[in-house]
């Protein structure tokens, strides 16, 4: 496989996974033959279908950065413990990937929550691309997982601070208001400069 022969895969600072979605494609073909047209609605009717598709995906290879990111000793350690990595409800994020692939798209992107093998939360940006020549059977899909935990933590902290500030105004036992004194300050600064 040309991608695996390239040092770029092994040396990439981004976690990369090569996965085989061909069993998912076979499931899609079966559902199409049964008359399914709106895959999103069909999957949401019974979310176990999403989980079933997830279990059909085979991890073929990962790069060293993937092992590092998920705190795995080796490929076997990682693949034997995928349930720990994907332990949260991933149906909503996985749904978007399945809909994209069902619609013939060769690129998809999501944010999701994964966990390292030692239990640390990872907020990730997942990007996937069906490699050229494999569009018909989805047998080779390149997935990257970028750790965006610091960014996500900052967003959560900002949201928490905003909610606390709003609550102080809404539930204060005394009257509170906000005034803009910037014009007063500008005038005082102007007078101070004139006095110097």
Please provide the spans of the model-predicted regions.
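Short loop/turn elements at sensory-signaling interfaces that couple input to output
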Residues: 118-141
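Terminal output helix/cap of sensory domains in signal transduction proteins
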Residues: 76, 82-113
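Sensory coupling linkers of modular signal transduction proteins
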Residues: 23, 133-136, 140-166
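PAS/LOV and allied N-terminal sensory domains
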Residues: 63-66, 194-195
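PAS/PAS-like sensory domain cap-loop motif
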Residues: 66-78
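PAS/LOV and related PAS-like sensory modules
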Residues: 1-48, 52, 156-195
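PAS-family sensory domains
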Residues: 17, 60, 92, 97, 108, 110-122, 125-129, ...
């Amino acid at each position: 496989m040309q991608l695996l022969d390239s040092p770029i895969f092994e040396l990439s600072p981004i976690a990369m996974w090569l996965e085989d979605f061909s069993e998912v494609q076979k499931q899609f073909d079966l559902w199409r033959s049964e008359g399914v047209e709106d895959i999103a609605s069909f999957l949401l009717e019974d979310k176990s279908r999403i989980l079933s598709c997830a279990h059909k995906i085979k991890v073929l290879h990962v790069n060293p950065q993937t092992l590092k990111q998920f705190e795995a000793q080796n490929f076997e350690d990682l693949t034997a413990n995928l349930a720990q990595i994907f332990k949260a409800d991933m149906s909503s994020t996985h749904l978007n990937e399945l809909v994209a692939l069902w619609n013939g798209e060769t690129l998809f992107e999501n944010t999701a929550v994964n966990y390292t093998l030692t239990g640390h939360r990872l907020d990730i940006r997942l990007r996937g691309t069906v490699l050229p020549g494999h569009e018909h059977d989805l047998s080779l899909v390149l997935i990257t997982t970028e750790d965006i935990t610091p960014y996500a933590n900052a967003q959560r902290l900002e949201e928490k601070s905003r909610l606390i500030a709003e609550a102080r105004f809404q539930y204060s036992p005394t009257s509170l208001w906000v005034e803009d004194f910037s014009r007063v300050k500008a005038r005082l600064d102007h007078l101070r400069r004139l006095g110097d």
